[in-house]
Amino acid sequence: MKQLWLVMFLSVALIGCSDESTPEKLSAADISAGKVVADRECKGCHGLDGKGTAPGIPNLAGQRGRYIMAALKEYKEGTRTHAALRQVAANMSDDETRQVATFYASLRPIQAPKPDQFSAYENGKKVAATCTHCHGENGNSKTPGTPSLAGQQPVYFVNATHEYLTGERKSAPMDPMLRRMNRLDIESAALYFASQMPAERSAPPTGNAAEGEPRTAVCGGCHGSHGVSTDSATPTLAAQDPEYLTQAIKAYRTTRKHPLMSRLVAELSDQEIDNIVAFYTTQKSKPAESGETLLKEITTKCDRCHAGERDNPALAIPIIAGQDKDYLTLALRSYRDGKRGNSMMHNMSLPYGDSIIESLASYYANQPVR
C-alpha cells in the first residue's frame, strides 16, 4: 500500500502545491472589489460566505489567497480540467483574480460537517472476519490447499480478487462472498491482511529445501529475497501453504496466463517444483504494511506542507483541515489518476487506493479549521 494505496489528495481539488509566490496582502480595497466579483462569478457554488453550496464543492472561506489565485490561473490555462471553472476564470482579469482571492481569504474559515471517521484498517478487519473460516485467524491458513493471506502484498491481493470475480481464476467457494464485497471492502481487506504477521511453517513432507534454494535465484528477481516481496503488486511466497503454492505454480502450465511464469514453470520438473515449494514454505515472512499506524504515517507527511500554521510564502499550498470530505476525496482521486497536473501531489497520491483516500479525506474533514 505504500505503493498501492494506500496515503494523497479548488473545484475538483483544494489540495496541491504551486510555486505562485504572491504574498498574502489583504487590502480593504481588494476585499471590497473581490466581493463584487464573487457575487458575479462565484456565489452560485461557493456562496458569499465562502461555504460550498453542495457536497463536493470546496469551502473557500479563510483559504490562502495565493492558493486561490494559483488555482484560478491553472483553470484559465487549462491545467485543471473543469469546464465551468475554466469559463469563470477566463472571465476574470488578473486584478479581479487577485481581488476575489483576497475577498475569500479575508473571511472567517467555515468548518465543514464532520463525517464519520473511516478507517481502512478497521473496515478491513470487519470484512476479513468472513474470510477466517477458510483462510485462518488473521489470515494464517491451516487448511491444506488454502492460501495464507497474512503479510500478503495488498495490490496483488486486490488484483487476485478481481481475477476471481472475472473468472480468470476459478474458485467456486469464493464466488458468493466476493460478490458481496465492493472495491472499498476489497482494498480494506487487502490492507488488513497485509498488516498481519505471517506464521512460520515447518517443512512440508515432500521436497528438499536445500535443493530448492538454488532454483529460486530467478524467482527472487520479482518475489524478493527468500520470497518476501517488496513490490506491492507481486506476491510474497515465503511461509505460504505448500499445497496451495504447488497448485499455483503448476497452474502456469495449464490455466494461468503469464508468459514469463509459464515459460519458467515449463522448464521445471515436478520434483524441482516440490523443492522450490519446500524452500519458500520454510522461510520467514513479515507484514507488508503497517495498517493500524499507516494513516498516522501518511498524515504526518501531508502536514509537513498542509498544516495550517506552516505557511510558506514561496508556495501556494491550501489549508485542508475542516474541508468538505467529498471534495477532498475527489481531489485526491484526481491527483492519483493523473487528472491534475501538479507533479508533487501526483507523486504523493499515486500509490493510494480508494480505501486510503477515504480514510484521509474523512480524517482531514474532521480536523478543526484554523
Task: Describe each region flagged by the PLM.
Residues H135, Q153-P154, R179, L184-S188, ...:
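Extended non-catalytic domains of envelope/secretory-pathway proteins
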Residues L14-G16:
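C-terminal motif of bacterial Sec signal peptides marking the signal peptidase cleavage site
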Residues S18-E20:
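Bacterial signal peptide processing site
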